[in-house]
Amino acid sequence: MDRLFRGGSQPRRSFLDRLVYAFDVEHAKRTSNFEHLYKQWYQLLKSGQTDNFWLTSLEEEMAGLGVAIAAARREQIAKLNTFIDHEPDDVFPNVKLELDGTVEKMLDNMPALDVEEAYAAKLKSQRRNVLYNDNVDGVNRTDFKVYYKKKRMPAELCSTGEQK
């Protein structure tokens, strides 16, 4: 776990999703379904499929699942931050947990249904990215960030001992 904050975002995202699974049994199903749809969508685009109806259908379903995934992650982060804020610093380090993701940021400012529509439109606009091997932004790219309040620095810049 001490290397969790030194590498890429995928292990942190998986770690967070496992925390969410513990409190929301449907989260595992949503993430699995999202990953399946994402792979299908990606493969269709890579193979040159241009069936707009099929792609749009996948994007809308991915957007619905993506918003639910982002909302569950946000809820878990909020609960953890509340718990951490109420614990003395000698029991648990004074840290701030955050999510760095497009969908999560949209949920800060818009109702979930509007975010779902915006996310589906974003997926549609990113179809070209797949063809050019660029990243596709969404809940599949969300990063789980930890900040050490005492030193006002991200966990990845803290010493290994501080990270533990």
Question: What positions do the PLM features span?
Answer:
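Amphipathic, alpha-helical segments enriched in basic
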Residues: D2-F5, S9-L16, D51-L55, E59, ...
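Extended, charged alpha-helical "arm/stalk" segments used for dimerization and assembly
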Residues: M1-Q43
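Alpha-helical structural elements of signaling/regulatory helical domains
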Residues: V25-K29, T50, A72-E75
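Secondary-structure edge/capping motif, primarily at the C-terminal ends of alpha-helices
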Residues: L45-Q49
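Conserved NTPase motor "head" modules and their coupling/switch loops across ABC/AAA+ ATPases, GTPases
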Residues: F53-K164
